[in-house]
């Protein structure tokens, strides 16, 4: 049902120090909206600095889609407070605009209302916008305004020294990477637990479906909200951002070499479908190229192996150079019950689950098995709270009750929690287990059930507006705790200077620059 990790857990209990110094980072996306919930049509606020070069505040797909990025931190409470400080600062500098507190956008009337993120006149800035133009033409702009939270996680070197016998990160990069790939394979097999507990997009505004075909059996409320009664995360469904042509790429997560080869293959494999869009219309670029992926970042995945890139380096070249440095978890919806879109319970759960994913045995996976793990995810995404819901075990037809598998997993997570708590001298991780395991016996405790109840009563739009206003007031009134106004002003000015420097250092024409960077 789940891998037997009793030996690994016994090892962990004998090596509690191996988990000291886990490092994390959080990225949170949120749409800027007007006081009546419509997508903001203003440019990225100047007071928030230059989106191209600011260390903590940038934009994602759209000019109105803010993204907040924390520095790497080995203290969870400090990390979340830093993220809250960014939110406090932004709330004070948005005028009458608010941050939309849900993953799914609502009051967007027409796709042409969505302006692509702008990054200045430098070649790299223009290329970033052109990449987004390609995404818009390939998948539609509305899909790209869906927001989420990314959780970046790495285990300390001490863990790998004790667990895999490595000496240092440089000589041990193969073993460390193998350990993270094991984590990723287990995440594909069991990560559906994340949308089960924390999925918070069971409903959408009807405007989101306008002109789109869907086979999903939506129910509708009088206000025009569309929902699936047992859904957890429509953001992660095919309604959200998935690339059908990617499922045939055959990218696997068994070792560094084959993963990178698969990724590099995808960025040079022509796509008939995308070629039909054209690459240029006269002088106007429509996409970077017509390959299956314009660049590596276009690969849709619920989890990614990562390494910080050096200047001019692609993500896959960075991985080949130094191995996997950390992993990025991409399956979290915005938490509507938190003013910052994520909370400590979720972060602690992810710590526990990701540690378990490293410890648990994970046989290699073919691309076929990878596709078959998607069935469990889809079942949880679309009807995870259905009474008596079952989960497929492996790729044959055997199934077990979801609640039984979930509770078995939590039996293991509790032992990991005891190790982390014994080091910290408290019970915080065990309390997370107590709180979350109850949701397997009572699905009404899940985020999706709680938010759907409110949405059925008030409508998606009104729930979003009420929370946005409540959080705006709260964040504006709260004092900063870690950052200071002086530091924020300094970073704002420094970011503009960095952007000017980038623009001044360009030597190539945009066309030449594109040719050098995979454009066509």
Curated annotation (Swiss-Prot):
The keyword GTP-binding does not apply. GO terms for cellular component: cytosol. It holds the Pfam family Glu_cys_ligase. The keyword Protein biosynthesis does not apply. Signal peptide: none annotated. Pathway: Sulfur metabolism; glutathione biosynthesis; glutathione from L-cysteine and L-glutamate: step 1/2. It catalyses: L-cysteine + L-glutamate + ATP = gamma-L-glutamyl-L-cysteine + ADP + phosphate + H(+). GO terms for biological process: glutathione biosynthetic process. Keywords: ATP-binding, Glutathione biosynthesis, Ligase, Nucleotide-binding. One of its GO terms (molecular function) is ATP binding. Its EC number is 6.3.2.2. It is an enzyme of class 6 (ligase). SUPFAM superfamilies: Glutamine synthetase/guanido kinase (SSF55931). InterPro entries: Gln_synth/guanido_kin_cat_dom, Glu_cys_ligase, Glut_cys_ligase. Belongs to the glutamate--cysteine ligase type 1 family. Type 1 subfamily. This is Glutamate--cysteine ligase. The gene is gshA.
């Amino acid at each position: 049902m789940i891998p037997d990790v009793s030996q690994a857990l016994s090892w962990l209990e004998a090596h509690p120090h191996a988990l000291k110094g886990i490092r994390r980072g959080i990225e949170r996306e949120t749409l800027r909206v007007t006081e009546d919930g419509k997508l903001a049509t203003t440019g990225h606020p100047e007071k928030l600095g230059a989106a191209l070069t600011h260390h903590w505040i940038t934009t994602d797909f759209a000019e109105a889609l803010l993204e907040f990025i924390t520095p790497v931190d080995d203290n969870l409470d400090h990390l979340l407070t830093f993220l809250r400080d960014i939110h406090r600062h932004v709330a004070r500098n948005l005028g009458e605009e608010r941050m939309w507190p849900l993953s799914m956008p609502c009051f967007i009337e027409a796709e042409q209302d969505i302006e692509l993120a702008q990054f200045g006149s430098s070649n790299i800035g223009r290329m970033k916008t052109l990449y987004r133009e390609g995404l818009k033409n390939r998948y539609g702009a509305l899909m790209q305004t869906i927001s989420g939270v990314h959780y970046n996680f790495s285990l300390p070197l001490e863990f790998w020294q004790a667990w895999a016998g490595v000496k240092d990160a440089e000589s041990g990069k193969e073993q460390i990477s193998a350990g993270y790939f094991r984590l990723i394979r287990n995440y594909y097999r069991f990560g559906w637990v994340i949308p089960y507990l924390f999925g918070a997009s069971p409903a959408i505004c009807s405007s989101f479906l306008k002109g789109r075909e869907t086979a999903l059996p939506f129910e509708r409320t009088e206000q025009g909200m569309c929902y699936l009664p047992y859904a957890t995360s429509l953001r992660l469904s095919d309604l959200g951002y998935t690339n059908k042509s990617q499922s045939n790429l055959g990218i696997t997560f068994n070792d560094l070499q084959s993963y990178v080869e698969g990724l590099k293959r995808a960025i040079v494999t022509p796509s008939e479908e995308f070629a039909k869009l054209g690459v240029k219309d006269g002088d106007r670029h429509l996409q970077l190229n017509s390959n299956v992926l314009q660049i590596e970042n276009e690969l849709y995945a619920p989890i990614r192996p990562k390494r910080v890139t050096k200047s001019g380096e692609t993500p896959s070249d960075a991985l080949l150079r130094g191995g996997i440095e950390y992993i990025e978890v991409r399956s979290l919806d915005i938490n509507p019950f938190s003013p910052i879109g994520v909370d400590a319970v979720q972060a602690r759960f992810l710590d526990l689950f990701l540690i378990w994913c490293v410890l648990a045995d994970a046989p290699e996976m073919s691309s076929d098995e990878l596709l078959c793990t998607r069935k469990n995810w889809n079942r949880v995404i679309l009807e995870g709270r259905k009474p008596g819901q079952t989960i497929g075990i492996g790729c044959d037809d055997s199934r077990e009750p979801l609640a039984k598998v979930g509770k078995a997993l939590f039996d293991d997570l509790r032992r990991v929690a005891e190790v982390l708590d014994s080091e910290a001298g408290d019970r915080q991780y065990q309390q997370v287990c107590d709180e979350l395991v109850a949701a397997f016996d009572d699905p009404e405790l899940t985020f999706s059930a709680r938010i759907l109840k409110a949405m059925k009563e008030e409508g998606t739009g009104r729930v979003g507006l009420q929370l946005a206003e409540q959080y705006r007031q709260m964040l504006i009134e709260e004092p900063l705790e870690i950052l200071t106004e002086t530091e924020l002003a300094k970073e704002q000015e420094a970011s503009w200077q960095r952007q000017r420097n980038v623009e001044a250092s360009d030597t190539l024409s945009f066309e030449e620059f594109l040719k050098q960077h995979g454009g066509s």
